[in-house]
């Protein structure tokens, strides 16, 4: 069975959009203006993005991720990769998508847009949200077209074991696409699932430049998979979807490996410092192990703390509507000044006033 049989049947015979006129002296085919009010180096922004620039960036990323250049396609951040994946494989009213909550809420968002079934296999906080193969097998159904791992998981911070990913790929080789969202993998002391790409044709890995690379404003990411799957994605991706300035700035940033290495080490060091300070705070009941640039904590004062911190200009992520995380907060590790302000503000929170109705009684 070809892995392409998992692609939506109505898309299999569709044709890729192929831009033309890339090397033409006069671009009289694309209805562009001959002038631009701004320029960016050698790039004329009055023209649609050049495919050559995209190929260069894909090769640069392929080298970094240790894959072949035909195993990668650029996306507008990880969200775009999730959207494209659900659109390529899920048939409305027929196929299902499995996720492991608590996890990134955009998975369910795009599944709903595709009008597909959502299979939820909840993680248990008593085991620090560890996932097992038995859980997957007990939740899987024959119409499950996509199994989505987030590793490290957002918002819990833990990794999915690489052996578990490999076993899942093998177990559902001709039945499901296995997707691994690795938005935070650079912060982890663990190998990437990209190391499995050559072994499993039903594996897709999503990466982004928004987190560890510090380029969230560029909206750039990529889909990594074996070449036939990448070619299938080309059938549905929008033409000229990646902006010229985003690609050019990303290329420049990726050349600065020293900055990247230093920044990752700084975040890891700061993360350890913040965790130590959290451990000294009596209102924080649990600190979950993390392989990311954020920390998940449990506190019965989650609602009050969110309001208290907001009063001092600090935004944190709470989960008031979650049955699993209603008494938890996710807090991002920042630079030294941000981290110190966070710790000082948490320390100033007095458990004696936690019973106030902050929406009513707190004076701003």
UniProtKB/Swiss-Prot annotation:
Its EC number is 2.6.1.9. It comes from the Bacteria. This is Histidinol-phosphate aminotransferase 1. It comes from Legionella pneumophila subsp. pneumophila (strain Philadelphia 1 / ATCC 33152 / DSM 7513). GO terms for molecular function: histidinol-phosphate transaminase activity; pyridoxal phosphate binding. It catalyses: L-histidinol phosphate + 2-oxoglutarate = 3-(imidazol-4-yl)-2-oxopropyl phosphate + L-glutamate. Pathway: Amino-acid biosynthesis; L-histidine biosynthesis; L-histidine from 5-phospho-alpha-D-ribose 1-diphosphate: step 7/9. The keyword Repeat does not apply.
């Amino acid at each position: 069975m070809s892995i392409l049989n998992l692609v939506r049947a109505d898309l299999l015979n569709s044709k890729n959009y192929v831009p033309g006129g890339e090397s033409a002296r006069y671009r009289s085919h694309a209805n562009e203006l001959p002038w631009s009010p701004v320029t960016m180096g050698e790039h004329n922004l009055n023209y649609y993005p050049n495919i050559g620039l995209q190929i260069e960036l894909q090769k640069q990323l392929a080298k970094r991720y240790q894959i072949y250049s035909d195993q990668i396609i650029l996306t507008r951040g990880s969200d775009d990769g999730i959207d494209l994946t659900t659109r390529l494989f899920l048939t409305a009213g027929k196929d299902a998508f499995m996720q492991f909550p608590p996890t990134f809420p955009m998975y369910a968002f795009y599944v709903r847009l595709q009008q597909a079934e959502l299979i939820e296999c909840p993680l248990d906080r008593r085991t620090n949200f560890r996932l097992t193969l038995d859980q997957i097998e007990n939740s899987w159904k024959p119409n499950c077209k996509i199994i989505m791992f987030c590793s490290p998981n957002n918002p819990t911070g833990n990794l999915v074991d690489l052996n578990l990913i490999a076993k899942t790929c093998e177990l559902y080789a001709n039945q499901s696409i296995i997707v691994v969202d690795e938005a935070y993998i650079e912060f982890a002391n663990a190998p990437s699932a990209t190391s499995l790409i050559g072994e499993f044709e039903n594996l897709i890995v999503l990466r982004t430049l928004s987190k560890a690379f510090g380029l969230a404003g560029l909206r750039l990411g990529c889909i990594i998979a074996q070449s036939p799957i990448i070619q299938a994605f080309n059938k549905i991706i929008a033409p000229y979807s990646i902006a010229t300035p985003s690609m050019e700035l990303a290329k420049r940033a990726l050349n600065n490996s020293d900055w990247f290495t230093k920044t990752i080490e700084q975040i890891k060091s700061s993360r350890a410092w913040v965790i130590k300070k959290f451990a000294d705070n009596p209102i924080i009941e649990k600190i979950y192990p993390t392989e990311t640039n954020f920390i998940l904590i449990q506190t019965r004062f989650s609602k009050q703390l969110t309001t208290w911190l907001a009063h001092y200009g600090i935004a944190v992520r709470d989960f008031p509507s979650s049955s699993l995380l209603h008494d938890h907060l996710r807090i991002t590790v920042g630079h030294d000044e941000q981290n110190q302000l966070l710790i000082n503000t948490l320390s100033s929170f007095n458990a004696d006033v936690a019973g106030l109705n902050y929406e009513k009684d707190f004076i701003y």
